[in-house]
Curated annotation (Swiss-Prot):
Protein name from the UniProt record: 2-hydroxyacyl-CoA lyase 1
Keyword terms: Fatty acid metabolism, Lipid metabolism, Lyase, Magnesium, Metal-binding, Peroxisome, Phosphoprotein, Thiamine pyrophosphate
Sites of N6-succinyllysine modification: K351, K358, K365
Protein family membership: Belongs to the TPP enzyme family.
Self-association and partners: Homotetramer.
Source species: Homo sapiens
GO biological process: fatty acid alpha-oxidation; fatty acid metabolic process; methyl-branched fatty acid metabolic process; phytanic acid metabolic process; protein targeting to peroxisome
Reaction(s) catalysed (UniProt annotation): a 2-hydroxy-3-methyl fatty acyl-CoA = a 2-methyl-branched fatty aldehyde + formyl-CoA; an (R)-2-hydroxy-long-chain-fatty acyl-CoA = a long-chain fatty aldehyde + formyl-CoA; 2-hydroxy-3-methylhexadecanoyl-CoA = 2-methylpentadecanal + formyl-CoA; 2-hydroxyoctadecanoyl-CoA = heptadecanal + formyl-CoA
Cellular compartments annotated: Peroxisome
Phosphoserine PTM positions: S4
Organism phylogeny: Eukaryota, Metazoa, Chordata, Craniata, Vertebrata
Tissue: Widely expressed.
Named cofactor requirement(s): Mg(2+); thiamine diphosphate
């Protein structure tokens, strides 16, 4: 009898699709986002049969953005499943975005059959080669038996070192090809990345530099959020009374309403700090490269980062601390604890920062309190902030919508803000919101995702509203509508303009159709839609949306087409003639 059972087992067959699904399951993949078709449909079905959640999107780009956000939120890669050729090409933007943001992502793409290569096969394209520019690892398994090995390596590569995107190419003939089940050897779940620590001597030097600082500043980046360093960084801030500034996605590592947060005096803090400690924040365009006039010429930078190649970029640091940000921060705490010390909370530096914060907050409050209609950005965000649940996710994209919203909308929890990020990518918002929503439903039921979109940004992925309604996700979309990119025109000006020439000759490139009813996209799919023009309408619609947990909502918020942000001490990027 045992011999008979063995013979029976050895003849059992398994398809390539099921091998792929089981390999993903073994690596703790929880979510797949994608658009099915030839040749990947069977992979999605096999994954669902194993308990992996599949979220069907309306565009591969949005699917890839969503999968990458899963990597940031869970520290294990989300999977983006795409068809061959154009489907894979549509996902390249999401792969590049994940790499730029240092988020783990695994893209699985179908490809043409091996025996048709170079013959002009259906959607034939050099996919492995194309993806190498946008990934840490790009490969095609040599056989079905090699699939578990390649998938494990891709998952491991995506989370080890600096996280990033990886690609696995699956030939169409692999998907339904049957092999002996005993020929498949599944790899064990790859371990979480090893925790590395900084050199002891460098930690001692860093502690000394911090103690001797006259005007210190901590900058908390999204790398600190990804490293789950909130506990150690908050302790460092509170124990030593140090002012801190979060980068956009570093918001919430220490709550924005913390008394030592100097976000409202950002420019002043950067310009006059003499010692700056960077926790997972890169000296790229977001932090103005660390160069004058945004910084003092002799400012001392202490860089804390997981990636050695990042250390010393653009500016020579005083100290570099290479390692896991949470572990390195604990090392700093231990070293600082050896000699009792505290930065004086009544110092001249603290006084300067508090005065500037008070001045900037007053200017923003004055703009928010304006009663004139249409509303401006500050009025909108002031009323939104009043009702935001403290535990909600805030997803944001747009130009002024994102930049102004970042200064008004508060984050109190780490990894609860997602935006255009390092790559400044427009179109990420709805994909990110969908990813946050599926994670919230599984891990923190009852949490809302508030997705704040400029009207132009909404257009990139607006059809994902159907995805939101299909899965009935806890998302409230706020479309801040100024009829354009940066600025637009009102209806009367628009009509007057069209009297003279064809729209292609007279409509400015940044203008969109005025008073577009984006809320009707949501109602078309069964969600709730609101068109609001006054603070009272905004308050009421947001209150109703938050109270109704059975449906997603879209609130279309009309603002002054020429509205802009308050005057800045420095131009954000480059000067513009607009």
């Amino acid at each position: 009898m045992p011999d008979s059972n063995f013979a029976e087992r050895s003849e059992e067959q398994v398809s390539g699709a099921k091998v792929i699904a089981q390999a993903l399951k073994t690596q703790d993949v929880e979510y797949i986002f994608g658009i099915v078709g030839i040749p990947v449909t069977e992979i999605a079905i096999a994954a669902q049969q194993l308990g992996i959640k599949y979220i069907g999107m309306r565009n591969e780009q949005a699917a890839c953005y969503a999968a990458s956000a899963i990597g940031y939120l869970t520290s294990r890669p989300g999977v983006c499943l795409v068809v061959s050729g154009p489907g894979l090409i549509h996902a390249l933007g999401g792969m590049a975005n994940a790499n730029m943001n240092c988020w783990p992502l695994l893209v699985i793409g179908g490809s043409s059959e091996r025996n048709q290569e170079t013959m002009g096969a259906f959607q034939e394209f050099p996919q492995v080669e194309a993806c190498r520019l946008y990934t840490k690892f790009s490969a095609r398994p040599s056989s079905i038996e090699a699939i578990p090995f390649v998938i494990e390596k891709a998952v491991r590569s995506s989370i080890y070192g600096r996280p990033g995107a990886c690609y696995v190419d699956i030939p169409a003939d692999f998907v339904n090809l049957q092999v002996n089940v005993n020929s498949i050897k599944y790899m064990e779940r790859c371990m979480s990345p090893p925790i590395s620590m900084a050199e002891t001597s460098a930690v001692c030097t860093a502690a000394s530099v911090i103690r001797n600082a006259k005007q210190p500043l901590l900058i908390i980046g999204k790398g600190a959020a990804y490293a789950h360093a909130e506990e150690s960084i908050k302790k460092l801030v509170e124990q030593y009374k140090l002012p801190f500034l979060p980068t956009p996605m570093g918001k919430g590592v220490v709550p924005d309403n913390h008394p030592y947060c100097v976000g409202a005096a950002r420019s002043r803090a950067l310009q006059f700090a003499d010692v700056i400690v960077l926790f997972g924040a890169r000296l790229n365009w977001i932090l103005h490269f660390g160069l004058p006039p945004r910084y003092q010429p002799d400012v001392k930078f202490i860089q804390v980062d997981i990636c050695a190649e990042e250390l010393g970029n653009n500016v020579k640091p005083a100290v570099t601390l290479l390692g896991n940000i949470h572990a390195v921060t604990k090392q700093l705490l231990e070293e600082l604890d050896k000699t009792p010390w505290q930065y004086p909370p009544e110092s001249k530096w603290w006084k300067t920062l508090r005065e500037k914060m008070k001045s900037n907050e007053a200017a923003s409050k004055e703009l928010a309190s304006k009663k004139s209609l249409p509303m401006n950005y500050y009025t909108v965000f002031y009323h939104v902030q009043e009702q935001l649940p403290r535990d909600c996710f805030v997803v944001s994209e747009g130009a002024n919508t994102m930049d102004i919203g970042r200064t008004v909308l508060q984050n109190y929890l780490p990894r609860h803000r997602l935006d255009a990020g390092t790559f400044g990518t427009m179109g990420v918002g709805l994909g990110f919101a969908i990813a946050a929503a599926v994670v919230a439903k599984d891990r923190s039921p009852g949490q809302w995702i508030i997705c704040v979109e400029g009207d132009s940004a909404f257009g990139f992925s607006g059809m994902e509203v159907e995805t939101i309604c299909r899965y009935n996700l806890p998302i409230i979309l706020l479309v801040v509508n100024n009829n354009g990119i940066y600025q637009g025109f009102d209806t009367d000006t628009w009509k007057e303009m069209l009297k003279f020439q064809d729209a292609t000759a007279v409509v400015p490139p940044m203008c969109l159709l005025p008073n577009s009813h984006y809320e009707q996209v949501m109602t078309a799919f069964g969600g709730k839609g609101y068109f609001v023009q006054t603070p009272e309408e905004l308050q009421k619609s947001l209150r109703q949306s938050l109270a109704d947990t059975t449906k997603p909502s879209l609130i279309n918020i009309m603002i002054e087409p020429q509205a802009t942000r308050k005057a800045q001490d420095f131009h954000w990027l480059t000067r513009s003639n607009m």
